[in-house]
Amino acid sequence: MYLDADYKNKDEKFDAQFDDLVPSLMFSYQLAPTQSLRASYNMRISRPGIWFLNPFTDTSNPTAISYGNPDLESEKAHSLSVTFGSFSQKFNVNVSANYSFVNNGIEQYSFIKDGVMNSTYDNIGKSKSINLSLFLNWNMSPKTRFNINGRGAYVDYRSSGLDLKNHGWEGNVFGSFQQTLP
């Protein structure tokens, strides 16, 4: 992707080119007729929008100015996962483990220079997470079914340029019981 901008009444000009290779790999192995094991790697990109890149300085409030950063790179999110699945008429089970990370997240930050608040953007964000998830469907009888779906994760967010960080556990569980009446 290529961006180019010229401004009327301004000597500023900027351009940005994004040539991102976005790989994706998946391997699958059938352990038995009803069981499989999958491993995958995926990368997603998030390209900065024009306002993130635009170097034009908004001085409508002289005590707080904002401008873009034409040197921003695409944010790259990487994900590795392993999934086991087992399916039969009575039980369906899916268990997944996933590790995801971003080392160049696009973040807005502000700083004071010469008594003026400056706001702009940079690739200063970092995040990583480890996720475990489980899906279970149990057909207890032809008229009775039980489902449970759960996920737990440890997440770690950091902003190197701002010396900010946050980490902790998160999760959710959903269950259902279905009974068909005569």
Describe each PLM feature range.
Residues 26, 30, 36-40, 77, ...:
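Membrane-spanning beta-strand positions in outer-membrane beta-barrel proteins
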Residues 35, 78, 84-86, 144, ...:
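Polar/charged side chains located within well-ordered beta-strands of beta-rich proteins
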Residues 27-29, 43, 84-86, 136-138, ...:
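Residue-level signature of outer-membrane beta-barrel architecture
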